Amino acid sequence: CLKEGFTVFRDQQFSADQLSAVVQRLEDVAFLQTHQFAEDAGPLAHAVRPESFVEINNFYTLTIYEKGAEIARMLHTFLGADGFRRGSDHYFKTYDGQAAIVEDFLSSMAVANGLDVDAFVSQWLRWYRQPGTPVVSVNSVWQKDSQCLTLTLTQTQSAKNGSEPEPLP
């Protein structure tokens, strides 16, 4: 699941550099919403990294490719372009030619950016383990006197396929 999502993310970044980044992102999101969201909402919903599978063909899904790319994009946004590049460079240097796993990739991101490895890996693995599409609610409070807008974001996840909701970072 790591290489599939990472490859799609890199392809999306390349396409954005070649064309209009905004147009490319809008197209990617439209595809995600019309195709992958339907998979997540249906009876075949599964995590980006399923705990088990009946056959390897079950790994060729929009969730693994497209949602996996969105996790890579979140890491890119969280760490910044330079931080993500440092983490990627560390990952390729450390694990070139090996059968690396998601934990190795996340560990590289943490090490290269001076973050607590255990906490970082634990937090980000949640995105790989839980099926379904998170719902984010926004509450805004405008304080006229200080002209300050406070946003409170709340993320919820419904139980899917017998799994319990798990708080996501």
Enumerate the language-model features and the residues they cover.
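Hydrophobic alpha-helical and helix-loop surface patches within well-folded domains
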Residues: 1-146, 151
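Short amphipathic, basic-aromatic surface patches that mediate peripheral association
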Residues: 153-165
